[in-house]
Swiss-Prot record:
Family to which this protein belongs: Belongs to the DEFL family.
Keyword list, A-Z: Antimicrobial, Disulfide bond, Fungicide, Plant defense, Secreted, Signal
GO cellular component entries: extracellular region
Species in which this protein is naturally found: Arabidopsis thaliana
Cystine crosslinks: 45-65, 51-74, 55-76
InterPro entries given in the database record: Scorpion_toxin-like_sf
Identification of the protein by name: Putative defensin-like protein 29
Entry annotated with the keyword Signal: yes
Localization (cell): Secreted
One BP term from GO: defense response to fungus
Upper taxonomic lineage: Eukaryota, Viridiplantae, Streptophyta, Embryophyta, Tracheophyta
Signal peptide: 1-26
Domain of life: Eukaryota
Length: 79
């Protein structure tokens, strides 16, 4: 039988998993052509066939796929 401390921890862990947003947007600064720009990472490019169109629909000036780590990520221009 689990102790009450373990049960409280498991309940807390389940609540965090349920309340966490399904897609977390990360804001990162990337240097492109010696200019610093802020980007919002939307997710894998495979999920967004037209990254630029998706970003414009989200009210950003535009977007592009950038290689972040080993994956190509759809990033929207923040500023």
């Amino acid at each position: 039988m689990a102790s009450s401390g373990k049960c409280v921890f498991l309940v807390f862990l389940c609540m965090v998993a349920l309340l966490a947003p399904s897609e977390v947007h990360a804001k990162s600064m990337v240097e492109v052509n010696a200019a610093h720009k802020w980007y919002i990472v939307e997710g894998l490019c495979s999920k967004f066939p037209d990254c630029n169109k998706h970003c414009k629909e989200q009210k950003f000036p535009g977007g592009t796929c950038l290689k972040l780590g080993v994956n190509m990520m759809c990033t929207c221009i923040y500023s």
